[in-house]
């Protein structure tokens, strides 16, 4: 669940020991399915339900931009959904690529679980599935993700998978110089640590 009561700052987390991660399975009644043509609305509905977008239509636009238009990767192989026993699509995540670190690197992207299905280990099962997909595609040694302060419960999950918060002083955002990035990142990490009571 996104906590909109606190300020939003972006965070980056990365992992180098990509062969080591916990193994979680979906609870009974849920199954993994991959994207197929026409599923953009399902993705957008999930993301809108968790407040990623103000409207489903905006979510569809972002899906097409991020996963369909001018993309060398296949959404059918990399965009994951979770479906419940009624056939409803209730969660999604993707293994994609990104260039925050200056070169094309694999990333966990757009993780979301509908609030009605939260607390059941679905996000953890998706993380295990995506790490296994990462390895099956022949990648090794580095993977990252972006998240934000309002998603601090997710930060704790990612840490259990060995992801670490980026704390270096080199900016990974094009709109911030190193000094501004460092100040913002320190504020963000302090806020997350406060919310996680550590």
PLM segments and residue spans:
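A short beta-loop-alpha structural element at the N-terminal edge
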Residues: 31-43
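Acyl-donor-binding surface of acyltransferase catalytic domains
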Residues: 1-28
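Conserved beta-strand-loop-alpha-helix junction that forms the acyl-donor binding cleft
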Residues: 144-155, 171-182
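Conserved acetyl-CoA-binding loop-helix of GNAT-fold acetyltransferases
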Residues: 110-113, 119-136, 156-160
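A conserved beta-strand-loop-helix scaffold within acyl/acetyltransferase catalytic domains
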Residues: 47-112
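Conserved GNAT acetyl-CoA-binding A-motif
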Residues: 134-147
């Amino acid at each position: 669940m996104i906590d909109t009561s606190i300020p939003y700052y972006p965070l980056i987390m990365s992992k180098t020991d990509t062969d080591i991660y916990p193994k979680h399975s979906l609870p009974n009644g849920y199954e993994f399915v991959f994207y197929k043509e026409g599923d953009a609305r399902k993705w957008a509905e999930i993301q809108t339900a968790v407040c990623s977008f103000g409207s489903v239509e905006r979510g569809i636009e972002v899906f097409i931009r991020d996963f369909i238009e001018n993309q060398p990767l296949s959404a059918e192989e990399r965009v994951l959904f979770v479906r419940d026993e009624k056939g409803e699509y209730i969660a999604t995540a993707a293994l994609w690529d990104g260039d925050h670190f200056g070169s094309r690197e694999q990333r966990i992207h757009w993780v979301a679980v509908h609030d009605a299905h939260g607390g059941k280990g679905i996000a953890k099962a998706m993380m295990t599935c995506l790490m296994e997909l990462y390895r099956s595609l022949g990648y090794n040694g580095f993977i990252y993700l972006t998240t934000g302060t309002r998603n601090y419960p997710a930060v704790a999950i990612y840490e259990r998978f060995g992801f670490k918060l980026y704390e270096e002083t080199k900016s990974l955002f094009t709109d911030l110089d190193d000094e501004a990035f460092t100040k913002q990142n320190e504020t963000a990490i302090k806020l997350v640590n406060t919310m996680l009571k550590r």
